[in-house]
Amino acid sequence: MVIVLIMLAGMSGDSGPGAPTSEKPSDATPSSADAPVLFIRDYAWAYEDTAWNARLAIPKAYYDFYRSRPHDRLENYAQYALSDYDRDYLEGLIGDFREAGDAKDYTRTDDVLNVLAFVQSMPYTPDKLTTGYDEYPRYPIETLVDGGGDCEDTAILAAAILNEMGYGTVLIRVQGHMALGVKCTDDHPGAYYEFEGARYYYLDTTCKGLGIGQVPGEYTHSAVTILPMARQPRMDANFSFLVEDEGPVNARCRVHCNVSNVGTGTARNATVYIAGLAPGQGAGQAWAPDAYVSIGDVGEGAAGWVEATLTIPRNETTQIECVLYGDNFEPVEVKSGLFYL
């Protein structure tokens, strides 16, 4: 027997036994008593001879959601810039930049520099001081609510904004520092790095006044790592099992496997393999029947569970295994300890 329940991500959802629910924060307001708590944040910056300002109202539920998300994706900080759920609030800020550009007849270069000036205006705050962690990369919503951050936080925010505005962007990691690159035409002046056939010009979000292609002196000759902007689902799994119907020869074992997408973007064609391994019968052997449970696509922030019932021989060494795999994420393998019934 196989059972599947996935809790789908969405703005809001039904609740109750057997109904899909969501990890994603809801900003629905069914009544005034349920009105969300909002963070109101005002920002002021200047580009060339013009002073600009913007105001954002960000639900506390969204901030809390991102605070609870994993902050250990140190292999590619670009993932923090690509979450599906903060696009609505970034769009409000992006709308301000677009209106500003239209009002001043800004070129595309001006638009980039205006975003850069906005991010450079934010206070630099070390992670250790503000969070207690040596490294705490912030999601864009966190940086906007906190009103600043360190180099990777403001680089992530700038990359998220420019990416949504249609600019090709990458993150640029140098020793002890994070910046970003913006895709420009080949005749643009300044320092650039080639990546996948394109030139990405250096932007520093913590050094006020530096423009496109201007690298701080201490990083001029540093080796760099380019971090592409691509969503990367990251799946998590754990399981428990319950022994049922112990007979003289076999026992039935119900395995309950929890799955969740803690990365960015949608995990495609997820499947869980559930088996009772039989190490005494040889490497890779499993008691029949094992089970393949198809989940399908799992959205960012979605979580749920699958179940399968296995037949386990009595008095034989057994180990339960669950393997979660799919098209665009790294497989996750979890096993129990050895046991016999």
Where are these regions (language model features)?
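Short acidic, flexible loop segments centered on an aromatic residue
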Residues: T266-G282
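Secondary-structure boundary elements
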Residues: E75-D146
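Hydrophobic/aromatic-rich core segments of domains that either
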Residues: D153-Q232
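Short proline/glycine- and polar residue-rich coil/turn motifs
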Residues: S294-G304
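Secretory targeting signatures
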Residues: M1-A33, L180, C257, A267
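Terminal connector regions
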Residues: A286-A291, L310-L341
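Short beta-strand elements of extracellular/lumenal beta-sandwich folds
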Residues: V249-T266
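Low-complexity, acidic Ser/Thr/Pro/Gly-rich terminal tails and inter-domain linkers that flank the onset
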Residues: I226-N250, L341
